[in-house]
Amino acid sequence: MEYSRKTYLDLNIMAKYILILSLFFGPGLSWDVFYSGDEDQLSLARERRAANYNPSPHMSTWERNEIQQEILNILGLQHRPRPPSLRGGQNQFCAQFTEWSYYRTLNIDEQSGHPSETEPQPGGLASNAIYNSPDSSGIGSVMSGTVFNYTRNEVQAVSQADTIMSLPVHYKDAAIEDTEHRYRFDIGRIPQGETVTSAELRVFRDAGRQGRSLYRIDVLLLRERGSDGSRSPVYLDSTIVGAGDHGWLVFDMTSATSTWRSYPGANVGLQLRVESLQGLNIDPTDAGVVGVGNNEGREPFMVVFFQRNEEVIATNSHLRRNRRAATRQKKGGKRPRKPDTDNDIASRDSASSLNSDWQCKRKNLFVNFEDLDWQEWIIAPLGYVAFYCQGECAFPLNGHANATNHAIVQTLVHHMSPSHVPQPCCAPTKLSPITVLYYDDSRNVVLKKYKNMVVRACGCL
């Protein structure tokens, strides 16, 4: 079995992640953010949580903060998000509902973090047609009568994106020039090191508010006023709706988002324009278009799709770790920690000789975000099973060891000369991502995929 340099780097990152957990946590539940061991132990841990069981923590505040910061670093966050209280009525629920629908679309198994190979089939053709899907997530109950729509382009964008961010209307500039159909979005919180691959505006159309007519709805990009006082708006996208079209309209905003990101001063807002097929201007409200100020959870919002730049993100993560290491050194280095004799991960070597089930294998490790008090910014999942690898890679290696050729040779040499060459290590050989839905500091809803977070298979390396 051959591994590329990138694979070894990924395995190294995961090994560091597991090492951090194993240094501090074990099935003894010294801190119940993490549960490890077999299924019975996990069930017992959950029962104790349900009974408000709270074991005495073995770690100091410093160690707790270090663990939290390391996990945030793995998640690509510089600090714990602290979203402000909800502003703007029900509009935020539109964005959250959409992201939750994307979360469900990805069909993530929260226990294993493994995405299903199946994809939803919207059944439509045009990129901005309306497709309705009833809500069963629970979040949509805030928006009575609201339906969520998929487009074919959107399904593809969701599956290819590493990060998806929903942007509600920026309330500071919500009603530009006193009209509910001109609005602005704050893209200042778009993450660094990620490239915009697609962006869309979602506007709700209520079929019950208008007569039996066809309308053309255009989205225009507003620009700074010229010397004559005019804005000279730029056409972005349009769609035609009929009398029975009810739901969220989707417009392509990729070019506008790229412009705003390159030139933040150019972001002066968007405008909706509605015309009859005869070319007559129609008030958008008369055509059933819901604008700013709606308190039924149907205000316009944007969704932006990103793909990460691995090199930039890896560099930023490395720099953050170096800064934190330097800070620790200035404060006197790493704090000493008493050995945890109850932690069977830390005492793996001594335990393995007494354990008949000693071979390298995957074991359960549950990471609980609620016990980190992160539920105020993490929407889903509440936790996930990360798993870890533990066991011996001793001679002779059997077929279940999933060993590399190098590990087999190393085992033979170790068997002949154990004092000169160590045994191969039991480590992850296959990893899979998880998807996390959370609020950022501006209470934008973010859906992000994190690679190499779940151990799918273990082997001797």
Curated annotation (Swiss-Prot):
What Pfam families does the record point to?
TGF_beta, TGFb_propeptide
A cellular component annotation (GO) from this entry = extracellular space
Matching PROSITE patterns, A to Z? Answer: TGF_BETA_1, TGF_BETA_2
Q: Name one GO molecular function term.
A: cytokine activity
**Which SMART domains does the protein's record reference?**
TGFB
Q: Which residues form the signal peptide?
A: 1-30
Propeptide-annotated positions?
Answer: 31-338
Main location per the UniProt record: secreted
Basic residues composition-biased segments:
318-337
Keywords in UniProt for this one?
Cleavage on pair of basic residues, Cytokine, Disulfide bond, Glycoprotein, Growth factor, Secreted, Signal
Protein localization: Secreted
Q: Which cysteines are joined by disulfide bonds?
A: C360-C426, C389-C458, C393-C460
Q: Which residues are glycosylated?
A: N149, N402
Region annotated Disordered, chain positions:
317-351
Q: Where is the composition biased (Basic and acidic residues)?
A: 338-347
Describe its assembly: Homodimer; disulfide-linked.
What family is this protein classified in?
Belongs to the TGF-beta family.
**What protein is this chain from?**
Protein DVR-1 homolog
Taxonomic classification:
Eukaryota, Metazoa, Echinodermata, Eleutherozoa, Echinozoa
